[in-house]
Amino acid sequence: MKLTIKQDVSEILEIKKSKFIGYAFFCENVETANNYLKQLRNEHKKATHVCFAYVINSNEKASDDGEPQGTAGLPILEIIKKRKLTNVLIVVVRYFGGIKLGAGGLVRAYGESATLALNSAATTNLTEATEFSLALNYGEESVLNSLKNNGDIYNLKFEYSDKISITFLADENLEVLKTLKITKGETKLIRV
């Protein structure tokens, strides 16, 4: 059985005045990973480095983004592989604090940052999942809470406008989805 993470997370680590922000994302495909990378590079334009690694299905990639070769991307990739995860992108954004860490220090810092991010992410078995979309009226929080608290639903994303739009991945035979289909409100579950 393959493991993946259930939700996107981030953690901050400071070492010798350098700030390392570790992000972990669930990614269905490489295109999704590239979109996250583009988003983070735009968000952290003043960062010294945006290093990453991913394992997505049979695809693996690691980038040191200007750090000495093998000191950033590979340690991140090793953390993903050690935990036997798939469909995961880890990005570590570094803001240089003025003190050089040396090659060994960089390996430890990037590895620790990746570990911190993954430690805060719950894991789940990766099954053949179906993507669902759900639009809720404000006030239907019980439905929202049942989704948030369900261990078999992952990659939960929210968008707030006149309704609460939710997309997520789940096994289409999941019991909580059957209860969503019979709610008497205007909740509509759509298979994407």
Residue ranges and their predicted role:
Residues S161-I164:
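N-terminal positively charged helical leader segments and presequences
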Residues Y54-V55, T86-F96:
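Glycine- and acidic-rich phosphate- and metal-coordinating loops
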Residues M1-T71, K157, I182-V192:
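C-terminal regulatory domains involved in ligand/effector binding and gene-expression control
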Residues L106, Y110-A129:
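Long, charge-dense
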Residues T123-Y138, I166-T167:
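Short glycine-/aliphatic-rich beta-strand segments at the starts of folded cytosolic domains
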Residues L134-I153, L177:
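Short amphipathic alpha-helix segments
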Residues F168-L177:
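Terminal, non-globular segments
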Residues L101:
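Short Cys/His-based metal-binding microdomains
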